[in-house]
Swiss-Prot record:
One of its GO terms (cellular component) is plasma membrane. The keyword Ligase does not apply. It is a multi-pass membrane protein. It is found in: Cell membrane. Probably functions as a manganese efflux pump. This is Putative manganese efflux pump MntP. Belongs to the MntP (TC 9.B.29) family.
Amino acid sequence: MSILSIVLTGFGLAMDAFAVSVAKGITLTRVKAKDALKVALFFGGFQALMPLIGWGAGRYFADYIKAFDHWIAFILLGFIGGKMIFEALKEEDEEKAEVAVSMEVNKNKEREFANMKRKEELSAKNLTVLAIATSIDALAVGVSFAFLGISIVQTIIIIGIITFVLCFLGVIIGEKLGDIFKNYAEIVGGVILILIGINILLEHTGIIEKLFS
């Protein structure tokens, strides 16, 4: 397996993580470099770790994972995406029911809410769930690496770096999109996650291939 093939594989595996990173950037306000760095580290780290686990597990484990990996990704992404949409709609209803208060109080509440939302979106638990969901494919691919006679250390470093860079940029790009979508940012982010989950499910069940064959 050539370096070029490994790089292309890395880009392919990183696409879901990149899309989720864009969704993260959309739902966050005033993204800081450390926010993008945290997301990139989680996604890049898991994208490198999963192939290593798969490589160590062997061919037998590959058959086991392939049977349900798409369902795991679909359920995790669908749940997180649905939760984001539900919370966004709930917040919108609550805002309509609130009595008008002074502009200064509103600004303080918005800042408090933004800080609380940032902590939730960037929590280790939240990022771990998303990182696992978007790196399950890498686990299955990693199993095949065991039979290709390649340097697994070099391979996972390349894959990890590619994912890290793409996800860092994804968060920044997402923030710019968030300025456009404004109040609908979290709904858009949730929809993106659900669509990614559906895409993974359709690809692995062969439905997309049948539709375009």
